[in-house]
Amino acid sequence: MIYNFSVENKIRLDEFLRENLPNCVKNQEISNSKIRRLIIAGSVFVNNSQIRRPAYIVFPKSKISVNFDENKFFYEKQPDDIKYEVTQKDVLFEDEYLIVINKPSLFPTEETIVGGQKRDNLHQAVIRWIWKNNPSLRNPPYVGIMHRLDRETSGAILFTKQRCVNNDIHKMFEEHSVKKIYHAIAVTNQKNQIKDSFFIENYMGRISPKSSAAKWGFVPEKNGGLYSKTEFKILNKSNYKNMDLFYIEAQLKTGRTHQIRVHLSSAGLPLLGDELYGGIPEKRIMLHSKCLEFVHPITKEQLKINAPIPDFFNKYYNL
């Protein structure tokens, strides 16, 4: 089904679709993450040009078309998410403006609708946590989503508690001034020497059909690919049940969907548990957001926030 729109006011593309697309779909809600996925997947065209940037600005008289299959869009199989509530030990940093949580694996960052039902998510869990600790509030507290972690990725993730810091934090992420360090366990059967440090840079986009599981890969810039770069460092090597394992530190220089997963797979080092990109099956994808480092937008303090390595990683390494 193709839906066509005409723009009346200057606005971000994702915000325009959030306001207008639900009116075309009867009895269905469309979450922010669904809107973002539609755009990144290449389903949205502005003036006949494919646009993959949710923050893209559209202007009056622009023509927008959206092409998607409603049945596949709304009625996906419900994943087996864990049940989770934030506890004090999960709070890595908190003040009146910001909160950083140690996200568990197998729990989505934000709301999605699967099989016609809303899934619980970390964003709502943080709202519940703040409200629980501020029972005098008459309405749910504000919590802003600044970035996202994949459902199976654990570790440090930042939310805002006041709208006044949103622009500064958004700008930090857009300008890549937030230092993001991940730890990962990758597996390989390559006989070639793996360098102790290396980087990968290329252009990325969705390579799977819209009717199948979302998969990203290398896409030329002229075809809508977005620049991506990751720096890698090998921290340790071992052998586990005849598998060559590498304990890796990854520093994101950009923040594309599945970026670390795609880059390591392209280097012959798919993440353990990441079957989508060639990894060996495991209970979870072995990727953890280890550290966020940034300047506090109000106090100007340099913050370095570390998330403890999950116990499950110790199955392979004594970390």
Show where each model-derived region lies:
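RNA pseudouridine synthases
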Residues: 1-319
